[in-house]
Amino acid sequence: MERYAIGIDLGGTSVKYAVVASSGKMPFSGQLPAFAQESAEAVLGQVLKGVEACREYAVSEGLMLAGVGVGTPGVVSADGRTVLGGAENIAGWENIPLAGRVEEAEGLKTLAGNDANMMALGETLFGAAKGATDVVFVTVGTGIGCGALMDGRLYRGYRNRGMEMGHITVKCDGEGCACGGVGCLEHYASTSALVRRFCELNGSARDAEVDGKDVVLFYKEGNPAAVQAMEEHWNYLAHGIASMINLFAPQRVVVGGGISEAGDFYLEKLREGVRRQMMSVCGEETELVAARLGNRAGCMGAAGLVLDKMG
């Protein structure tokens, strides 16, 4: 018998929402602007609109909902109730009683979790890591997020405060990062970093019209600045992934984010770099694959969390 839950994926630009079935089907979904630079209340309002749209659909179709799962940037309390902080892309997003606010407004039991963890769970339950018990999920975008499952369970660190792969040090004498650290992986290997580095090497000002897909296109055309920027990107990202393999020895590393969809050549170059840098005994059974769910992973993982805990 199919069971259903609402999955919300909150990001810096949008709020994605969906009704998700235990089989992985997604009969209803949508997206709203996040208003992330306005205020925490504005963001909460958009989350609630997404939940309400899903609830109305479920009522119209006669579907019973197990509850609501919300994937959010930042650190979430161990009980899945409160966003403690660490979401640099959402203004004022700290000490937010997220689960309580949704429950109060919609009358549905709610759990929150870190967005990368929810994506990792989504890919493990329904996507590229289905059937695996030990998985590392890496998302490469404006930042770098990471989630992991060990023995089939999300690994979050003590009180949900771990797995900030984007802020491991890859250059000990490197530049400062927005987190306050120095030489962070995110500062050198994110898509934002790739574009910034391309512009530096190309002798041009940072162009708002240039994005990661453009740099990939320039790389394919043989543009020297793009070639060097991409090689540096792969090297830094491989360093970070190899470190995760050495620590966790996962069955699969799933790489998501828009740039991971650049083509097979992108993943193959990354695999080459990872093989050079990892301990072979740690990664001899690790498969590095592209994410399969695209921008659905966060909603599907958040709903999957609720179906597991409340269904």
Q: Predicted regions span which residues?
A:
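Short glycine-rich, Thr/Ser-proximal phosphate-binding strand/loop in the N-terminal lobe
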Residues: 2-49, 82-85, 160
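Short glycine-aspartate micro-motif
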Residues: 5-9, 65-69, 135-139, 145, ...
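Glycine-rich phosphate-binding/hydrolytic loop that grips phosphoryl groups
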Residues: 20, 111-124, 261-311
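A mobile "lid/hinge" subdomain adjacent to the ATP/sugar-phosphate binding pocket shared
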Residues: 20, 185-254, 286-287
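Glycine-rich phosphate-binding loop and adjoining helix at the ATP-binding site
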Residues: 36, 40-48, 52, 63-68, ...
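Glycine-rich beta-strand-to-loop/alpha-helix junction loops that act as flexible
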Residues: 68-74, 255-259, 291
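Glycine-rich phosphate-binding loop of actin/hexokinase-like ATP-binding domains
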Residues: 130-188
